Amino acid sequence: TLSSRRDRQMTIILTPFMSCSAKLPIYAFFTSVFFPGKGALIMIFLYVFGILTGIIFALILKGSLFKGEPVPFVMELPNYRMPGAKNVCQLLWEKAKDFLQRAFTVIFVATIVIWFLQTFDLRFNIVTESKDSILAILAGYIAPIFNPLGFGDWRISTALISGFMAKESVVSTLSILYGSTQSLLMSLTTPAALSLLIFCLLYTPCIAAIAAIKRELNGKWALIVVFGQCLIAWLASFVVYHLILLVF
């Protein structure tokens, strides 16, 4: 509904910095395990951190890629009326149909790829242990990237990759790979857990959001968002992790 293409692009790019409901299970899980009794404080911190990151990045974009005078926002408010059930259903169907037609292909392909990587090993045999899957092997190569952030474990990398499909799957994947919260507690320090929460807050949104970005902008911008947010998440986690180590 934004008339300015500049404002519309910036809104689409910045929206993933905000916490969505799919990230709440991650927050709840880690706060209960690593920060018992301080869950509300950690939750508020994560929400505020995401908002501040979005504001800072918006100011950077306004001064670089999206320079220009802001378009005055004037909206004429219509007379409010109770919508009819038929109109509501028709509008919902049109929006859902449009999303499915444009985004379903991307979501379907990504789902198949993740399922395949989780199910088979390098010889294309069905795995009985998650650690033998292609996804776990790939995660093992990626894991060293996260060593400076305090969580260079292949199991966490596997969970983050699965989170690309749906953020809720991060918790379920960790539960399967670690087996118990005690194993997770032994694997991660408290600063590393907060660093991981920051990364989960800011790294690439799920495939459905990426498909929506591709639909509204284009494939190039979707890739920029994916890699850009991963870089921002890495830098933010690095700073938070090492600041905590310095202070405590």
Positions of predicted regions on the chain:
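Membrane-interface helix starts
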Residues: 97-109, 152-157
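Short amphipathic alpha-helical coupling elements at transmembrane boundaries
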Residues: 87-98, 140-148
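Hydrophobic core segments of alpha-helical transmembrane domains in multi-pass membrane transport
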Residues: 31-33, 47-61, 107-120, 196-202, ...
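Membrane-embedded alpha-helical segments of transport systems
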Residues: 11-28, 45-54, 164-171, 201-205, ...
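Transmembrane helix-loop junctions at the membrane interface of multipass transporters and ion channels
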Residues: 17, 21-44, 208-217, 239-248
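Juxtamembrane inter-helical linkers in multi-pass membrane proteins
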Residues: 67-91
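Small-residue-enriched core segments of transmembrane alpha-helices in multipass membrane transport
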Residues: 16-19, 34-35, 40-57, 128-147, ...
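Extended, low-charge hydrophobic alpha-helical regions
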Residues: 1-11, 112-230
